[in-house]
Amino acid sequence: MLISKKTLAVLIPEITHVSNNEICEKLQQIGIEVEAIRAFKNPDYLQLGILRAVTPHPHDNHLYVCQVQIDKNKQLNVVTGAVNIVDPNNLNKHVIVAKKGAELLNGLIIKTKNIKGIISDGMLCSYVDINPFSKHLIADGDDTHAIVLDNINRDEFGDYLSFLNLDDVVFEVTLPTNRSDLQSLIFLAKELAAVLKRPVFLEQKTTMTLREFYRFPLNLRNRAQANFFGGLFLRDVAITSSPWTTKGLLINQELRPVNCFVDQANMVTVYTGQPIHCHDADKIHGSVELKLATQLETMLALDNKEYEIKPGDLVVADEQGTIAIVGIIGSKRTMVDNTTNNIFFEVVNYNHERIKQTAQRLGVANFASRLMSKPISLQATENCLNYLQNNFLNPESIGKISKFSSTIKAPAFNRKIYLNFNQLRELIGVTKKQLNDHMIRNYLTSLGFKMENQIARAPAYRQDITVWQDISEELLKILDLNKIKEDEILSSTKLEKHEKLNAYDALQKLRTKLQTLGFHNVITYQLISPERARNFNLFGLSNLWEIKNPLSNERSVLRVGLIDSLLRVIQKNAAYKNKLGNIFEFSFVKTKDSNQLHIAALWLEKMFGSTYQKDQGVSVDIPAMKGLAQLIISNFGFNCDFEPITEGEYFTKNVGLKLVVFNEQIGYVGLIKDELLAPYDLKGRPVYGLEINLDRLLNSLNRLERSYTPISKLQDVFKDITFSFPRDESHFETFVKAIKKLQTIFKWELISVFDTEKDGVPITKYTVRYYLKNFTNTPLTLEQIKAVETQLKQQCELAKIALDL
């Protein structure tokens, strides 16, 4: 879901003075997860100007020469091909001009040019020139027409952003799965205003007397099957284009402007969460009814596609056939266009499961179907009708707008819930001083509850409130759980810093090394969808943690790998046209069986590359990835061995390796299979990935084992042993495994290492001192010492370790 700050400001005017970060915090406080914040990148050298004169180009019938005033005493000569400029009604209105030196977001640099004998000092901008990333949302004609703005102060020559609502900020959010009511910006604003402690303005009920001037033929025989079926009728309309302020708001929320009436209806849907179908009333034949389709039928829709209607689909139909697939899309036959004189605004509230099934079968996921595929309350429908009516109520429309075609009775509140305030405080973990009875009543009232002493009645649209424990979650929204003082947790397993064994320092050094190499450290969500959890599960982890009441399916389980999350970061940045780079992340991977620290990295761009010298930099390939893996592992004082992956689920055949330390597999590195990159919009682009389980390395550094034994009065007994390996086959860990098998040796230390030759073969000699454990209070005998020495030699011989006897 997209939330426009400017749209929200209609309901919470003071939100314009609230920082974006605070809005994010408060949205998260009421359970709404903020995925991203979108803000427009403003090109330099663009400004408002006034169109003073337009003449045909003397040498080209498709071009025009414009005089554009950009200051009180300065005009520019601009050649344009925008045909709407020749309309005499546009003279002395404001346009947006790109001056010499401007670099538009599509890469075009504006220069002074001689265009067929006429000097042009700039360019008149269309919306696509300014915001090319929204080209697919531009209304017909607006992609080539120069922007012409009405009702601007005649001396205004400055910033143009506010007149297109490009100074807006849009929050990309995910709603809790049990809060479909928050699809309505009205209900969302009420909760957000409560936690922001700002006034909110929501009510829009008309007090004007409206007449039933037009008996629109609605057949209500099937109305009982719907929560509501009806709408409004508007007559004698003049279809025009919406002002750019309205178009800008719609585009910001990824809705395509159409015309002034359809655009207003779409804005009402944004506020209320209730979709509206707009029909040209004069193109409707006979009566209109809501029904379940009984036979196969095709409908040419507003998007110029044909859709197959099957028995059981919910439709609105006239006597000639279907005019809308409810909650999904309308028919082109009754489309509102420039010839329309009378409009019927159709509103339906019906079982969302049936609409969801039809939308999935048809493969439609548009604005209307996303809303109607979830429950919509009668309060949202009632708000829709009121907002729709008020949007068109003005002196010119009196006598043109009808009453509601059908009555709607939406209860204001839900069932009664009896509250014990002390129980609430105990459940939340606060004192009466922190949350007294008066505060509880005020908080719940600000969230829309009706309070009668210790009885709370939730708003009827709050279907998620069923028991008194649910009320505690509402209070936490206002209290802000993050500000409640924490209780100290006493633990006997506190992390201790040791002067020699400090894993934190090792991780910090590794982070610095990777950042020096140009890798960006990112932090991604631990919670993902069950489907995504199966992606790139390199270590085959199972027994996942599941969230009981997740905000959404997208945040319902704890992940078991990091590469999927990193690929999502690349995908998101690519969608925003940001420059891509190499990234890495440290994060714990948790299952019900384990909790281990991983590092993952994606390498897809040249290291130390240059924009000016394309050949400069370190290209990514498997040797480079081996070097990266070795750098990470050597940071903890270990060496890494590599074993090939001949057939793998995730990496391209023969371009993947297992990472092995002390004969233990700790990670993978390789070229990610191309077909796996398709869901991330990276298919066809080589992406190398790496993921390492750092837990073993960190445990080796951080584990501090203590044993407490009485101080012995006996002298330590120790012996030395010398052994060797061929220099190229030195495996000291083989000796470590051998000596650990002897319970009679309680510690050992390496006292010398040197390289030499034996029979002309280079070897490495090791000398180890080992200490014998005394199980009695008497000195060890020579026989006991000799027995331990013999046992150690036997273990070495079994391990094929050459001893120096």
From Swiss-Prot:
SMART domains in the cross-refs: B3_4, B5
Obligatory cofactor(s): Mg(2+)
Domain named tRNA-binding: residues: 40-162
Superkingdom of the organism of origin: Bacteria
Domain B5: 412-486
Binding site for Mg(2+): 464, 470, 473-474
Cellular compartment(s): Cytoplasm
Entry's EC annotation: 6.1.1.20
Disulfide bond positions: none
Catalyzed reaction equations: tRNA(Phe) + L-phenylalanine + ATP = L-phenylalanyl-tRNA(Phe) + AMP + diphosphate + H(+)
Listed GO biological process terms: phenylalanyl-tRNA aminoacylation
Pfam families: B3_4, tRNA_bind, tRNA_synthFbeta
Cofactor binding note: Binds 2 magnesium ions per tetramer.
CC terms in the record's Gene Ontology section: phenylalanine-tRNA ligase complex
Swiss-Prot/TrEMBL keywords: Aminoacyl-tRNA synthetase, ATP-binding, Cytoplasm, Ligase, Magnesium, Metal-binding, Nucleotide-binding, Protein biosynthesis, RNA-binding, tRNA-binding
GO molecular function, one term: tRNA binding
Cited InterPro entries: aa-tRNA-synth_II/BPL/LPL, B3/B4_tRNA-bd, DNA-bd_dom_put_sf, NA-bd_OB-fold, Phe-tRNA-ligase_IIc_bsu, Phe-tRNA-ligase_IIc_bsu_bact, Phe-tRNA_synthase-like_B3/B4, PheRS_beta_core
Similarity comment: family membership: Belongs to the phenylalanyl-tRNA synthetase beta subunit family. Type 1 subfamily.
Summary of subunit composition and partner proteins: Tetramer of two alpha and two beta subunits.
Protein name per the record: Phenylalanine--tRNA ligase beta subunit
Organism: Mycoplasma pneumoniae (strain ATCC 29342 / M129 / Subtype 1) (Mycoplasmoides pneumoniae)
